[in-house]
């Protein structure tokens, strides 16, 4: 548990660091207005206003974008965003790793699963529970203008996993949380196998006879030897043995 806590703290620090860099890029994007490179590059761009990971202009743009360099030197499709791509990929990996660790840790054992739906709005995400399986799907439509015409592209994901045998379909809930992550939860803690009720205590059985068998009756005591007529003996069974009285 100590190693798991250290790993989670390290992951959280890395996520906070990358989030700070992303907030700085958002501030730069708010300063600049609509990107003018969509005239030439928009067939390859998935967004209209350049939010951080969805702009793909840098993947197809030429060595120097004349419109951006002339009017918007702070455009997000410049060399800075190109260099930030590894950080963005690293952030997504960290988020996926964190979700898996949290889903498998003991403190969140009521979480049946989590699906990363980054890039989709909450109303675009659908969760369906049927036949002991959970299906999470999301779909969106991208529309952009290219040389006076409109073009459309579609993006969708679909994830499916099975429910544990002890979870009822009616008890499954889901929530759209931070980090664009859909969490599938159950009110009770899932277990790997159905819990067995405690066995009632069996009534006490009568004491069994000794293994050596019932005790045999005591053999009859041997009769006392005939007493000396001159010396009467003590009655049989006394603590003193028969003896002669010497006068």
Curated annotation (Swiss-Prot):
Keywords: Cell projection, Cilium, Cytoplasm, Cytoskeleton, Developmental protein, Differentiation, Flagellum, Phosphoprotein, Repeat, Spermatogenesis
Domain of life per record: Eukaryota
Region (2 X 5 AA repeats of [RC]-C-L-C-D): 34-78
Compartments in which it is found: Cell projection, Cilium, Flagellum; Cytoplasm, Cytoskeleton; Cytoplasm, Cytoskeleton, Microtubule organizing center, Centrosome
Sequence repeats: 34-38, 74-78
Major place of residence: other
Keyword Nucleus attached: no
Biological processes per GO annotation: cell differentiation; spermatogenesis
Sequence segments annotated as region (C-X-P repeat region): 195-235
Result of knocking out the encoding gene: Absent sperm head. Does not affect localization of Ccdc42 to the centrosome or sperm flagellum.
Residues with PTM Phosphoserine: 5, 10, 64, 87, 108-109, 137, 153, 175, 180
GO terms for cellular component: centrosome; cytoplasm; manchette; outer dense fiber; sperm flagellum
Function: Component of the outer dense fibers (ODF) of spermatozoa. ODF are filamentous structures located on the outside of the axoneme in the midpiece and principal piece of the mammalian sperm tail and may help to maintain the passive elastic structures and elastic recoil of the sperm tail.
Domain remarks in the Swiss-Prot or TrEMBL record: The C-terminal contains many C-X-P repeats.
Quaternary structure and partners: Interacts (via leucine zipper motif) with TCP11. Interacts with SPAG4. Interacts with KLC3. Interacts with CCDC42.
Protein name per UniProt: Outer dense fiber protein 1
Lineage: Eukaryota, Metazoa, Chordata, Craniata, Vertebrata
């Amino acid at each position: 548990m100590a190693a798991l806590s250290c790993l989670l703290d390290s992951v959280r620090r890395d996520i906070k660091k990358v989030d700070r860099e992303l907030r700085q890029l958002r501030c730069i994007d708010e300063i600049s207005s609509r990107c003018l490179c969509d005239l030439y590059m928009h067939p390859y761009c998935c967004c209209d206003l350049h939010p951080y990971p969805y702009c793909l202009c840098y993947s197809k743009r030429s060595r120097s974008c004349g419109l951006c360099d002339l009017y918007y030197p702070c455009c997000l499709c410049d060399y800075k965003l190109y260099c930030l791509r590894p950080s963005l990929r690293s952030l997504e990996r960290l988020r996926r790793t964190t979700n898996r660790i949290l889903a498998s840790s003991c403190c969140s054992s009521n979480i049946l699963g989590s699906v990363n739906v980054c890039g989709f709005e909450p109303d675009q995400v659908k969760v369906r529970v049927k036949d002991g399986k959970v299906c999470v799907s999301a779909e969106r439509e991208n529309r952009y203008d290219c040389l006076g015409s409109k073009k459309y592209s579609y993006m969708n994901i679909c994830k499916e996993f099975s429910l544990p045998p002890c979870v009822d379909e009616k008890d499954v809930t889901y929530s759209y949380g931070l980090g664009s992550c859909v969490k599938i939860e159950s009110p009770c803690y899932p277990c790997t196998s159905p819990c067995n009720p405690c066995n009632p205590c069996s009534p006490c059985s009568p004491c069994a006879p000794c293994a050596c068998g019932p005790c045999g009756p005591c053999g009859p005591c041997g009769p006392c030897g005939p007493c000396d007529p001159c010396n009467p003996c003590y009655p049989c069974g006394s603590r003193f043995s028969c003896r002669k009285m010497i006068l």
